[in-house]
Structures are given as C-alpha cells and as structure tokens.
Amino acid sequence: MTYEIHPLPIILMSDFDIVVIGAGHAGCEAALAAARLGHKTLLAVMNVDTIGAMSCNPAIGGLAKGHLVREIDALGGEMARVIDATSIQFRRLNTSKGPAVQSSRAQADRLLYRLQMKSVIEHQENLTVSQTEVNGFIVEDGKITGVTTTIDEKISVKAAIVATGTFLNGLVHIGLKNFPAGRLGDGPSTGLADWFYDNGFAVGRMKTGTVPRIDSLTIDYSELEAQESDMPPAHFSFDSQGKGYTLPQLPCYITYTNEKTHEIIRKGIDQSPLYAGIIQGIGARYCPSIEDKIMRFPEKDRHQVFLEPEGLDTVEVYPNGLPTSLPLEVQIEMLQSIKGLENARIIRPGYAIEYDYIDPLGLRPSLATKKIENLYLAGQINGTSGYEEAAAQGLMAGINATRYLEEREPLILDRSQAYIGVLIDDLVTCGTKEPYRLFTSRAEYRLLLREDNADSRLCQIGKDIGLLDEDKHQRYLIKQAAIDAGCATLDAISIKPTAEVNRILNDAASADLKQKSALSSLLRRPEINITFLQKLPLTAGDKEAVIALANSAVCQEVQVRIKFKGYLQRQEEQVQRFKRMETLKLPEDLNYAQLSGLSNEVVEKLSTIRPISLGQASRISGITPAAVSVLQVHLRKLNYLKSNDKI
C-alpha cells in the first residue's frame, strides 16, 4: 500500500493584539498588564510548567529591588501579591540606616511562587497561554504583523514584547563542558536569536551563574547562626496589609568559606570555564562567582554564605554566595570544606550560562525598539540582571504596547518619579556592557523615592492608566488622608519645657527643651521618634492620639515626612530644575552633524542614542556642558525655548 504524502499546512491561530514571548518575571508582568488593559494577549512560552519560575535565588526584593517591587505593585503589577502569598521569610534590610536606603526582602517557596503566578496568568481575562516556540517575526512596512513558530504556526499580532531572559543562544557551562540550554533542564531559543542577528540588531553576549542546590538533610545546622524572619512579617503589596501570612516562616542559616575552601578553588581554577577563556560573555560585577571572589580578593580569609530554604515541602537549599561553574567534583569538595556542609550532597550542580542580549541603546524610553516601532524588549534581553528589574521592565513594556495600539503617548516614568524610571533611563541613555543591577546609589532623588512611599508616588498613575482598581485606589486615598492627619496631629500638640520633660529628654541623650514646642518640632531631633513621644507628660487625649499614630500603618511615613522635611524640600527643588531640562524636547529627526560646535564624538553619540530631551542628552557619557549649551541654543532657534528662560 502506498500513501500520498502532503506537506503539513501552516496552522493559523486566532489573531491577537499583543504577543508576549517568554513567561519569566518580565513576560508575566507584560502579559498581565496588556490583558488587564483590555487587549487580546498571547503569552508564548516554551514550557508552560515554567511560567513564573525563579531560575536563580528563591527570593524577591533586596536593596533597591524592594523599591521596585513596591513600585510595580503601586502601578497595578502582580509580583508583590504573589510573593506575599508564597513567602516563607520576610526581613527589613538597612534598618539602622536612613529611610532612603531601607528595603525589604522575602524568601519564597520556589514551587508555590511559580504555581501562584501560573494560576494568576491562567485565570486572567483576555490572556491566552500557548506552549510554543516563536522563532521569528513577520515584518511588513517596518512593523511587526505576526510571528512564526518552530511548528509552522503563523500568528497575526499588532505588537510584540520579547522577554526571553537567558534563552537566546543560551549556553550552560559546568567545568570545561558546555551545552546549549536556556537554563539547566530547558533548551535554548536559537531561531529567535538568529532573527535578531539577521535583522541588524546590535547583539552582545553576557554571562551569569547560579549556585549548586544542596540537600538540607545532609547539612549540620547545630553550630550555624540562624537568621529568623521579622515577626510579625511585613508585606510588599498594599493589598496585603492586615491580611496576615498563611505560610510558616523559616530561618536561613549563616556559614563561611575558609582557607581550605579557597585552596580547593585555587587548585581547580584551571578547570573553570571563565579562567580557561571558554566563556566570552561579560559577567555580573555585583554577583561574582565564588572562584572570581577568591582570585580577585586573595586578602580575604572568608566569604559569607547564606543557606536559604527553597520551600516548605522540599529538602533543597540555596547556598547564597557560592555561584560557581567549576566541575561537579570540585563543587562537592569545595562545599564539604565549609562548616556545617561537611557531608553536604549536591542535588543540582552550580553552573554558568552565556546568552545573547540586545544593546539597550537601541531602545526608546518606552522600551520599544528604534528599528521597529511595535517591537518591545523587556528583562535580561536588555542587559539587566534580577527578577525585580525584569518585572519592572515587563510591566512598562506591557503598558506601553497597549498605549501604542491605542495611539496614546507612552508612559515614561522619569528619574524623579520612580526607581523604574532610573532603571530604564540608565539603560536607554547609557547602555550597559555587563549585567545591570539597580542600587539606591543610582538614584539622585532617593530620599523622595523611598520604599514606603511608592504608593504615594505611583498609585494615582496606576489608576489613571487603568491598571489599579477602584478598591485599591480608595485604600490609597485613605492612607494619604491618614498621613496628612498624622502630621497635623503632631503639629497641633505642643509641650512646655518642664523639669519632667527635660529629664525624659535627657534620658534619651536629647537636649533640654527651651520653649514651648510642637511635637513635630521635637520629632526633628535625630534621637527622637514617634514611639518616644508617648513617654512625654501629655494630656490623656493627646497621649491617646500619639499612641494611635505610633501603632498605625502610616507611622513610618509620617515620621519621615516630618523628620526630613528640610531635606525633602531641597530635593523637591532639585527635581523642579531637573524637570525643566526634561521638558525641553529634542526633535527626533534632528541632524546633529549640522550643528556647529559639536565634536565628532558628541555627534556620533547623540545620533546613536537620539535623546528625547535636553535632560536625557546631558546624562549621556561624554556629552559635555558645552555640547548641552549648543543644543540649548539650537532649541531657542527652533522656538522651543525663549531666550530668557533659565535652566
């Protein structure tokens, strides 16, 4: 019997407004934002079981990263709610320092986090999930009109968001062995990587790494220092206030490497793919491998290691501080030289991964590419590292892709509004040659961009764009009213300088009160806080009001607003000067080569980056004050700026 063979037909799926490629932290936020804003969205993922997967450490937040999580939440994103529902430890960091640099970090149950995010995705209206691998785009008249897949699907779309993480030409290294993978256990995306190369995008190569996972049953915790959760644990999401935690809170444990550990690493360094010259990608400066730390800092006799549980129902432990790509046998020997890990068994080896990224200088502040106006990039493909940085970009890409389809101006948060604005402005203005990590030190106005006031800064924007529901917006308004009332209360209550008052102040190493003063005036003293004010001899009604404020959810923000009033006003004045520069828009088609007074280097940088404002131009590396003055003069000629305006 003979059979007639027919070529397989191209499968035509339904048309979609937006396709999101990749379902990590960037892809999930992008897809949810697009769908919640009313657009028919397709989430294309190579394996639906990895939606929301935490590929590296089982934690959300940290220094500056906690700020991002709160900002994502204030705008209507999902990450904060998911970590609140799946957290097994919560800690406030930098509490001995100023409010600008205090941040939150939560350990997650890795499995529950992924399943919770997957459930949110699956139940979201307007959002379709498809297990498929996109390998290219259909481009007509300079715009994307569809995507193709490895199984010959052809899907019509009006905009696309690429959030592929480490999957573009991913290559895993363990010792001198390497193999293609997007992460250990998952294949890479090669077809889509080829598409970016073939279509003239500036593609670079980066590298990151992760730690070996070890069996908790083989760890001796008896002599290790426990690090307990803050109790009661706090929350990231403003939705979670007062709801309480349902999961048990687990401790982490602290141990250290030692000279024996370092000697084992030095002996095996010739088998490190990084030091053998096999890895070409640039690694993360602020998350170096343990072998890199040993070789670069030989004077250090030990390095801290945090043993972090990966969940309630698993024995896997994440030894934070030990990312490595050394051979498995060296990893075992290294681990077993560390106190508490003498009998440790590795469940999953540590490894390094190289991957393609797209130069973010090719992006607009909306995260749309300059080459194709309806193609958006978010996450590690833009050269960043970290779940939180990825999620923030995904949220903004999702918002702006919908606004593009609605022919509305993109939402661009500036550096004075949010850490999200700092992150994106750094990427599109300065670019990056190594995995970018956000720090509070990158923000010029960090006292205004505190973690505790993310809702004050961004909830109204979230409501205006349509992501923040009315219930949450009303809670935000109630909180703002409570802050205002708290400040007014401390302004209204005054106290006289009596012997008892001065004794109480002296006990706190505070100077005598010389004249009748409002409690808000006393609160501006560095050694005084709202809790201390309860000790003062107040009337029954005033004491009750102070106690209520000290125990309220707005206590911290009231305290910061009063205690740092002068500094906040100063930063607000700086912001006004900054905003004047940002409002001076540069024409998109400006021919910089025709402007006299600009060097060839300046012309090249301005022509490449195409800054949207005089402010952005001034932040480009190598753009001198003289060059900014040339641009300012040109804007005057174009009637963009009156000659007597001051900057």
UniProtKB/Swiss-Prot annotation:
InterPro entries: FAD/NAD-bd_sf, GIDA_C_N, MnmG, MnmG-rel, MnmG-rel_CS, MnmG_C, MnmG_C_subdom, MnmG_C_subdom_sf
Cellular component GO terms, alphabetical: cytosol
UniProt GO molecular function: flavin adenine dinucleotide binding
Residues given in the record as NAD(+) binding sites: 283-297
Subcellular location per the Swiss-Prot or TrEMBL entry: Cytoplasm
Coiled coil: none
Protein origin, superkingdom: Bacteria
Keywords: Cytoplasm, FAD, Flavoprotein, NAD, tRNA processing
Cofactor: FAD
PROSITE patterns, sorted: GIDA_1 (PS01280), GIDA_2 (PS01281)
Binding site for FAD: G22, A23, G24, H25, A26, G27, V134, S189, Q380
Any Pfam family: GIDA_C_1st
Biological process per Gene Ontology, one example term: tRNA wobble uridine modification
PANTHER family per UniProt: GLUCOSE INHIBITED DIVISION PROTEIN A, PROTEIN MTO1 HOMOLOG, MITOCHONDRIAL
Subunit structure: Homodimer. Heterotetramer of two MnmE and two MnmG subunits.
Function statement: NAD-binding protein involved in the addition of a carboxymethylaminomethyl (cmnm) group at the wobble position (U34) of certain tRNAs, forming tRNA-cmnm(5)s(2)U34.
Family membership noted in the UniProt record: Belongs to the MnmG family.
Protein name: tRNA uridine 5-carboxymethylaminomethyl modification enzyme MnmG
